C-alpha cells in the first residue's frame, strides 16, 4: 500500500508548485504539510516523493522560459562547433549554469545520509526559515539592484549556484531564498536575481528528482500518486512563476521575509506543543 494516497498527492503537488520558486522554502512547507496529514516525513519513500514532484515544477520552468532556453542551448551548440560564436553571452551562460551546479551535486552526494537524517528535522526547518528571512532582508537592503541579466558573470553564477548548498543542508532556508539573496548581494536587480535562480534550479532540481525516483517507486509510493503530484505541481508552479516575476518587478522581498518569520514561529509552536514532532 502506498504511504501517500492520491488525495494527499494533490495537496502536496499544489504546495510544491506554489512554494518551489518562491523564497519561502518548498521543503519546509512540504514537511509541515506532510506532518499535519500524518505522513511520516522521514520515510525514504516520502523524501523521494517530495524530490520527484519537483520535476513537475521544473517542467513548468522549461515551458515558461522555453524561448530563452532554446536561445541559450542553441548558442551553446553553435559555440561548441564554432569558436567565433563563443563570445556570445548565451554561450557563456550555458557553461556557467553547468559549472555552478557542480558544487551542490558534490555536497548532495557526499552528505546524503546527513541531509536525510539529522538535518531533515522540523526544528532545523523552523530555525532555517527564521534565519533565512534575516539574510533575505539584509540582502534586499544591501543590494543596489543596478545590474541586469545581461550583466551577470561567471563569478555571479558560481556564487549564486553554490549558495544552493545552504538550502540543501538546512531545509527551510529555501533554495530560491538563498540564490536570490546571494544575487541581490551581488547587486543584481530583483528580476535578474529571480530569473537567475530559475535557470540555476533546472539542472539541480531535475537531477535530484530523477535520482530519488528509484527510492520513491521502490519503497512505498505508488505510480498514481507520483504522477498526480507531479502534474499538479507543474500546473500550479507555472502560475506561481508568472506571478512571482510580476511581483518582484514592482515590490521588495519584505512580504516574503515577514511570511517566513510567521511560518517559522508557527512551526516552532506546533513542535513545542507536540502537534508536530
Curated annotation (Swiss-Prot):
Name of the protein in question: Undecaprenyl-diphosphatase 1
Assigned GO CC terms: plasma membrane
Family: Belongs to the UppP family.
Entry EC no(s): 3.6.1.27
HAMAP family linked: Undec_diphosphatase
Biological process annotations from GO: cell wall organization; peptidoglycan biosynthetic process; regulation of cell shape; response to antibiotic
Membrane topology: Multi-pass membrane protein
Gene Ontology terms, MF aspect: undecaprenyl-diphosphatase activity
Sorted UniProt keywords: Antibiotic resistance, Cell membrane, Cell shape, Cell wall biogenesis/degradation, Hydrolase, Membrane, Peptidoglycan synthesis, Transmembrane, Transmembrane helix
Substrates-to-products reaction catalysed: di-trans,octa-cis-undecaprenyl diphosphate + H2O = di-trans,octa-cis-undecaprenyl phosphate + phosphate + H(+)
Localization per record: Cell membrane
Amino acid at each position: 500500500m502506498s504511504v501517500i494516497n492520491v488525495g494527499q498527492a494533490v495537496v502536496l503537488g499544489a504546495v510544491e508548485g506554489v512554494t518551489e520558486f518562491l523564497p519561502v522554502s518548498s521543503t519546509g512547507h512540504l514537511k509541515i504539510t506532510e506532518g499535519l496529514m500524518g505522513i511520516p516525513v522521514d520515510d525514504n519513500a516520502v523524501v523521494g516523493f517530495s524530490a520527484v514532484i519537483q520535476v513537475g515544477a521544473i517542467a513548468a520552468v522549461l515551458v515558461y522560459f522555453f524561448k530563452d532556453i532554446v536561445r541559450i542551448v542553441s548558442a551553446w551548440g553553435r559555440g561548441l562547433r564554432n569558436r567565433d560564436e563563443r563570445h556570445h553571452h548565451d554561450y557563456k551562460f550555458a557553461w556557467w549554469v553547468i559549472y555552478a551546479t557542480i558544487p551542490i551535486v558534490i555536497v548532495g552526494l557526499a552528505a546524503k545520509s546527513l541531509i536525510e537524517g539529522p538535518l531533515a528535522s522540523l526544528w532545523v526547518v523552523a530555525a532555517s526559515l527564521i534565519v533565512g528571512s534575516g539574510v533575505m532582508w539584509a540582502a534586499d537592503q544591501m543590494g543596489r539592484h543596478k545590474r541586469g541579466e545581461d550583466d551577470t558573470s561567471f563569478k555571479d553564477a558560481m556564487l549564486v549556484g553554490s549558495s544552493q548548498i545552504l538550502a540543501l543542508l538546512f531545509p527551510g532556508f529555501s533554495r530560491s531564498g538563498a540564490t536570490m539573496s546571494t544575487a541581490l548581494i551581488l547587486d543584481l536587480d530583483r528580476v535578474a536575481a529571480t530569473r537567475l535562480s530559475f535557470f540555476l534550479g533546472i539542472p539541480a532540481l531535475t537531477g535530484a528528482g530523477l535520482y530519488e525516483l528509484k527510492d520513491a517507486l521502490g519503497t512505498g509510493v505508488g505510480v498514481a500518486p507520483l504522477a498526480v503530484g507531479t502534474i499538479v505541481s507543474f500546473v500550479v508552479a507555472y502560475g506561481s512563476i508568472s506571478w512571482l516575476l510580476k511581483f518582484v518587478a514592482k515590490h521588495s522581498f519584505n512580504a516574503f521575509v515577514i511570511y517566513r518569520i510567521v511560518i517559522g514561529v508557527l512551526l516552532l509552536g506546533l513542535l513545542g506543543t507536540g502537534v508536530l514532532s
